[in-house]
């Protein structure tokens, strides 16, 4: 039985949050404080066998918009520079990247999709080089799904307030 929020099941609410049907959706990985979906976990491959390199996908409209503003203000470049200056932060990213790869192999359960498994070795946000950040949304989603991931948590710490005063999905259903 699907979980329900505001009269909608979670999948329908995620679809509404994204404005499209979610691709390769497996489950919810995190919720906002109000109980709405915030992060989904995706399969490494969609039904057609095409790679889907983002394991944890941010769906909360408030967070998606806030992180888009961070990226537009040079956040990817700034955090890439921080990784070069902070070896402990870089080591934590490497640990999370290894965790991401292990999870993707586990979720694939022996399937290799159209790419013969090459995307299973990609890092967070589908990055071939973990030190070259691509998408802060994916790092924030990883941190919400796996508390303790420092880079994602530091990105989230830039959003004030992290969550809106009331649920941004409260009009659903």
Language model features with spans:
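Preference for intrinsically disordered or flexible, low-complexity segments
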Residues: 2-173
């Amino acid at each position: 039985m699907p979980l329900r929020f505001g009269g909608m099941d979670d999948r329908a609410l995620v679809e509404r949050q994204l404005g499209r049907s979610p691709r390769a959706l497996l489950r919810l990985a995190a919720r906002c404080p109000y109980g709405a979906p915030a992060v989904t976990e995706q399969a490494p491959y969609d039904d057609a066998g095409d790679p889907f390199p983002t394991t944890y996908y941010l769906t909360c409209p408030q967070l998606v918009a806030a992180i888009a503003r961070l990226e537009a203000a040079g956040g990817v470049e700034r955090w890439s520079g921080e990784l070069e200056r902070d070896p402990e932060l870089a080591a934590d990213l490497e640990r999370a990247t290894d965790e991401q790869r292990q999870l993707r192999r586990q979720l694939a359960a022996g399937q290799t999709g159209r790419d013969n498994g090459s995307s299973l070795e990609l890092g967070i946000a589908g990055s071939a080089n973990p030190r070259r950040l691509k998408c802060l949304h994916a790092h924030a989603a990883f941190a919400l799904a796996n508390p303790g991931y420092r880079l994602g948590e530091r990105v989230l710490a830039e959003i004030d307030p992290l969550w809106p005063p009331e649920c941004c999905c409260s009009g659903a259903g």
